[in-house]
Amino acid sequence: MGDVLRVSLIQTDIVWEDKRANLDKYAAILSHITGDCDLVVFPEMFTTGFSMRVEDLAECIDGETITEVKKWSRNYNVAIAGSFIARAGNVCFNRGFFIEPDGSEHYY
């Protein structure tokens, strides 16, 4: 990364509560914008929408969403930020993430 931070903000229609369809959609979008940016920012809960069925849709930190995001970050050499429905034990919540191309992971 140089002296200028190039950011891509992505906002799209989602397929309600369909992680796989939304991950596929974002993968296609990423293939067109990477190389021209340093940071990609996804919307809140981009894989499911802001669903109230959190128990059914939540996943662990090493689940499908973060696994895909880490792969994209590494393959496209871009940092990626967003959030997803996370599970920690019996608790579910909206967890923010920031994944760097070197594999560094940051959560809040």
Spans of features found by a protein language model:
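Active-site-proximal beta-strand elements of phosphoester/diester hydrolases
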Residues: 4-14, 18, 95, 107-108
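Cys-nucleophile CN-hydrolase/nitrilase-fold catalytic domain and related Cys-dependent amidase chemistry
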Residues: 19, 27-101, 106-107
